[in-house]
Regions:
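Asp-based, Mg2+/Mn2+-dependent phosphohydrolase catalytic module
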Residues: 1-5, 102, 116, 120-217
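Active-site neighborhood of HAD-like aspartate-dependent phosphohydrolases
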Residues: 1-46
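Generic enzyme active-site microenvironment
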Residues: 8-10, 111, 168
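Substrate-recognition element of Asp-dependent hydrolases with the DxDx(T/V) motif
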Residues: 26, 94-124
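Hydrophobic alpha-helical core bundles mediating ligand binding, dimerization, or RNAP-core interactions
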Residues: 26-30, 48, 52, 56, ...
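Short helix-capping segments at alpha-helix termini
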Residues: 32-37, 62-67, 103-104, 127-131, ...
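Alpha-helical substrate-recognition element adjacent to the catalytic core
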Residues: 32-63, 92
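Metal-dependent phosphoesterase signature
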Residues: 57-96, 104-106
């Protein structure tokens, strides 16, 4: 990993803890429609990772037809947008580690399944504008992770090869994204998935605290 020039990060569950606001928006929506569900925080931790539309689908227990799901998803977006920063915060030690990487000349990228506008807004609010070299969220017409397209787009933007990058993520989706892109995968077990789920994906290494990030460079 000594030749690494780029660090790619998932957003939700890796850089930023967003679960309370994601769950909150879903709860508002399912209560509006009197949907009989009593989800726990642990449930929502398992629902996230494949984008907001999939989150809504899982919150309604995958009972919605495609037309209704699209309608609910369109309702979810402004609900979440209103509260997305109420509780969201960077995990302890993340900013310090990112500063170390920047000092080493490492390119920093965010590759997330969160809608692009929401992703850019959140990252800039928490870390500052232009802190990251590249932020790529979910964009219509571009497949979401674990498809590697967004990851390849990020690498192209910063002028790096897959062999020069490490992908940090907290879920099986991220580990598969890295594998599909031919990139070293590092599991972050402080996020939304368990160590066991990450381990089953055979990443290069699993770290349980952000303080270990810079030690991989």
């Amino acid at each position: 990993m000594s030749k690494t020039k780029c660090a790619l990060f998932d957003l939700d569950g890796t850089l930023v803890n967003t679960i309370d606001d994601l769950a909150g928006a879903c709860e508002i929506l399912i209560k509006k429609y009197n949907f009989d569900a009593h989800w726990t925080k642990e449930d929502y931790l398992n629902f996230v990772g494949n984008g907001a539309k999939k989150l809504v689908e899982r919150a309604f227990n995958e009972t919605l037809d495609e037309i209704t799901l699209n309608e609910r998803y369109e309702e979810f977006k402004p609900l979440y947008d209103k509260i997305k920063l109420d509780h969201a915060h960077a995990y302890d030690g993340i900013k310090e580690q990112l500063d170390v990487l920047k000092g080493m000349g490492i390119k920093l990228c965010v590759v997330t399944n969160k809608p692009n506008v929401a992703a850019v807004g959140m990252v800039e609010h928490i870390f500052g504008k232009n802190y990251f070299d590249c932020i790529i969220g979910c964009i219509d017409g571009i497949p979401t992770k674990p498809d590697p397209t967004s990851t390849f787009n990020a690498l192209k933007k910063v002028g790096c090869k897959p062999s020069e990058a490490i992908f940090f993520g907290d879920s099986e989706v991220d580990m598969r994204t890295a594998k599909n892109a031919g990139i070293e995968a590092v599991g972050c077990s402080w996020g939304f998935r368990s160590f066991e789920i990450l381990f089953a994906e055979h990443p290069s290494v699993i770290i349980d605290e952000p303080k270990y990030i810079s030690k991989l460079f």
